[in-house]
């Protein structure tokens, strides 16, 4: 069984969300920025930060010219701030080695900082209309249910081949990829699928009576984790115009000093924070100079 391009594309034509990075005139760089931000982060949180980012830094060279600390500030509370650092590094390479133009092919994209298998294919597909399979959790879920009749499936080395076999052999392949992703994000969701409005008339999971999944879902806890502590420490540094003392950081997490120290050490190791000669702390690039006026 396959997935009908006619059914899927007809649905996508009227049901797709009006996301800013999908609009006409959006550049390959701006699409790349959206892909960095959308990793493990809901669309609703990404939209305002992406829009502000693109208004401020519309090109790779503009992003590269900004200091890493300003990039971290603009990233705000999107989470996983190492993505911001890698995005800045990616901008530097594109500006200096590719004349400010995002590479078109997957193999070259894979050589850029912070770009893995998914992001490389997403940029090639959505920015340059390349007919390449793009597989995220939403796409994997739709294909697993509609084609294989299971509720879920773990990531597999066969995913790319499986999705590639579904792509229509014409210029609609990139739109088909976007539609698969949209269907998984808005209709064929993990917890509460809206099968009553699904455009796919042939779905093996539905035909099989919706068998339960076998893959245990991990519930990602945030409260009390090192991620939360790292975020609180970064908040202090983002809000400061000068390096701060250890005492100013200590007060953000008094309940577990060892965890706080571990979180701070990890920020230093990741290159997101630096320590000055007198023992104070600042965002990367602002240790000696402070925040630019």
UniProtKB/Swiss-Prot annotation:
Gene3D superfamilies in the cross-refs: Helix-hairpin-Helix base-excision DNA repair enzymes (C-terminal) (1.10.1670.10), Hypothetical protein, domain 2 (1.10.340.30)
Catalytic residues in the record: 35
Catalysed reactions, semicolon-separated: Hydrolyzes free adenine bases from 7,8-dihydro-8-oxoguanine:adenine mismatched double-stranded DNA, leaving an apurinic site
Pfam families referenced in this protein's UniProt entry, alphabetically: EndIII_4Fe-2S, HHH, HhH-GPD
GO annotation terms (biological process): base-excision repair; mismatch repair
Source domain of life: Bacteria
Transmembrane domains' residue ranges: none
Enzyme Commission identifier(s): 3.2.2.31
Protein family (similarity comment): Belongs to the Nth/MutY family.
Purpose: Adenine glycosylase active on G:A and C:A mispairs, as well as processing 7,8-dihydro-8-oxoguanine:A (8-oxoG) mismatches.
Protein name (database record): Adenine DNA glycosylase
């Amino acid at each position: 069984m396959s997935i009908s391009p006619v059914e899927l594309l007809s649905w996508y034509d009227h049901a797709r969300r009006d996301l800013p990075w999908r609009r006409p005139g959006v550049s390959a760089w701006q699409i790349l920025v959206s892909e960095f931000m959308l990793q493990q982060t809901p669309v609703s949180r990404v939209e305002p930060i992406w829009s502000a980012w693109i208004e401020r830094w519309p090109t790779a060279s503009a992003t590269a010219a900004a200091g890493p600390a300003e990039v971290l500030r603009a990233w705000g509370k999107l989470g996983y701030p190492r993505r911001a650092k890698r995005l800045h590094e990616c901008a530097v390479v594109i500006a200096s080695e590719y004349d400010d133009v995002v590479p078109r092919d997957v193999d070259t994209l894979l050589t850029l900082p912070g770009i893995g298998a998914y992001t490389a294919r997403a940029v090639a597909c959505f920015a340059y209309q390349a007919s390449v399979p793009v597989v995220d959790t939403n796409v994997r879920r739709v294909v697993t249910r509609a084609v294989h009749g299971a509720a879920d499936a773990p990531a597999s080395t066969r995913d790319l081949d499986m999705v590639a076999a579904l792509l229509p052999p014409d210029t609609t392949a990139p739109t088909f990829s976007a539609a698969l992703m949209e269907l998984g994000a808005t209709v064929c969701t993990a917890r509460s699928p809206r099968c009553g409005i699904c455009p796919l008339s042939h779905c093996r999971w539905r035909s099989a009576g919706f068998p339960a999944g076998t893959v245990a879902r991990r519930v990602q806890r945030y409260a009390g984790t090192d991620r939360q502590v790292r975020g609180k420490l970064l908040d202090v540094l983002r809000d400061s115009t000068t390096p701060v003392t250890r005492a100013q950081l200590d007060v953000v997490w008094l309940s577990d000093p060892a965890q706080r120290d571990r979180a701070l050490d990890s920020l230093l190791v990741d290159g997101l924070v630096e320590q000055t000669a007198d023992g104070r702390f600042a965002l990367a690039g602002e240790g000696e100079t402070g925040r630019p006026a």
